[in-house]
A protein has these predicted regions:
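Conserved serine/cysteine hydrolase catalytic core
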Residues: 167, 176-225, 230-239
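Conserved alpha/beta-hydrolase catalytic His-Asp/Glu region
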Residues: 143-183
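Conserved HGGG/HGGXW glycine-rich cap/lid loop of the alpha/beta-hydrolase fold
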Residues: 1-58
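Active-site loop/oxyanion-hole signature of alpha/beta-hydrolase fold enzymes
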Residues: 45-86
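Flexible "cap/lid" loop of the alpha/beta hydrolase fold
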Residues: 102, 106-140
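Short beta-strand immediately N-terminal to the catalytic nucleophile in serine-hydrolase-like folds
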Residues: 87-89, 114
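Catalytic active-site module of serine/aspartate enzymes centered on a nucleophile-bearing elbow/loop
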Residues: 225-267
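Gly/Ala-rich beta-loop-alpha elbow adjacent to hydrolase catalytic centers
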Residues: 89-93, 97
Length: 267
C-alpha cells in the first residue's frame, strides 16, 4: 500500500497525526493538522500520513475503514519506530488511531483524540441522538452525492478552507465516500477503549465546545478509556486549528507522559 506521509521535524519524540474526512478529498493530513507544524520547532517530530483515497495517497479499493487504516498505522508506522510514538487522531481519524493503539499498545506513548467520531458511545444523550438522526438523513436523503458532502460538512462544522471540496467532482467523490464509510460499532469502540485503559495508555480527549453532541461524546470516550478531558474553545470541528492553545495542551500532555516513562525506566 502506498501512503503519502508528510514529515515535520527531524528529532525528538515522534507524534503520528491521523486525519478524518471522507475518501475523495484532495486535502491530506498536512491540511488537517497544518497548525501543528510548529511543534517541529518545539522538539517534536511529526508524521502526518494521508489516509488511502485522501490527499496524495491513492485509493486502495476499500471504503474508509477504521480497522483497516488502524492496521497500516500500527504495522507500517508504529512497528518501524523503536521508541514508539504518540498518536493523535481527529474525527474519524480518532477511530483509526484507537484501532492502531490496541493493535500495538506497547508502541503507543499516548493517545489524543480530537472530537472523535464515536457518537455511538453516547447514543443515550438527546443531543447525540438528534445529531445522529441528522447525519442519517444526510446520508440517505440527500438528492446527490455532492449535496451529501455539502450537508455533511455543514452539520459537522467543517470549514471550507480545511474540508476541501473545491470542485463539484471532488464534492461528488467525497459524497460517495461518505456513503461507503464504515463507522466502528459501539461494542468495538467500547472494547478498544477498555483495552486502552487496561494497557495504561495515557488518553486525552479534546473537544471545541461548539456542539453538545461532540461534548457528550468526548465525555463518554474519556470515561471509557480512563482519560483526561480538555475543551479548547472553537467555532467548529477543528479546535486544533483555531489557535496555539491546542499545541500547548498537547505538548504539555505528551511531555508529562514522556517524563513519567523516563522516571519509570530510571527506577
Amino acid at each position: 500500500m502506498t501512503i503519502h506521509t508528510t514529515r515535520w521535524g527531524q528529532s525528538g519524540p515522534t507524534v503520528i497525526c491521523i486525519h478524518g474526512s471522507a475518501q475523495g478529498s484532495r486535502v491530506g493530513g498536512d491540511g488537517h493538522f497544518a497548525a501543528q507544524q510548529v511543534l517541529a520547532e518545539r522538539g517534536w517530530q511529526l508524521l502526518v500520513p494521508d489516509r488511502p483515497g485522501h490527499g496524495q495517497s491513492p485509493a486502495n479499493g476499500q471504503p474508509d475503514d477504521a480497522e483497516l487504516d488502524g492496521a497500516w498505522v500500527a504495522d507500517d508506522l508504529l512497528a518501524n519506530l523503536p521508541g514508539g510514538a504518540h498518536l493523535v487522531g481527529h474525527s474519524f481519524g480518532g477511530a483509526v488511531a484507537l484501532a492502531a493503539a490496541v493493535r500495538r499498545p506497547g508502541a503507543v506513548r499516548s493517545l489524543t483524540l480530537i472530537e472523535p467520531g464515536m457518537q455511538k458511545l453516547a447514543s443515550r444523550d438527546p443531543a447525540v441522538r438528534r445529531f445522529g438522526m441528522q447525519l442519517l438523513a444526510i446520508k440517505y436523503l440527500s438528492p446527490s452525492a455532492a449535496q451529501r458532502a455539502r450537508r455533511f460538512a455543514a452539520a459537522v462544522g467543517i470549514p471550507p478552507e480545511i474540508g476541501g471540496a473545491k470542485s463539484r467532482a471532488e464534492l461528488t467523490a467525497m459524497g460517495r465516500g461518505l456513503f461507503r464509510l464504515k463507522v466502528p460499532s459501539a461494542a468495538t469502540l467500547q472494547r478498544q477503549l477498555a483495552d486502552v485503559a487496561k494497557a495504561g495508555i495515557p488518553l486525552l480527549v479534546v473537544t471545541g465546545g461548539w456542539h453538545p453532541a461532540f461534548e457528550a461524546t468526548g465525555d463518554a470516550v474519556a470515561k471509557l478509556g480512563n482519560g483526561t478531558r480538555s475543551v479548547i474553545a472553537s467555532p467548529h470541528h477543528f479546535p486544533n486549528q483555531v489557535s496555539d492553545e491546542f499545541n500547548q495542551v498537547l505538548a504539555t500532555f505528551m511531555a508529562k507522559v514522556d517524563a513519567r516513562r523516563t522516571s519509570a525506566v530510571a527506577f
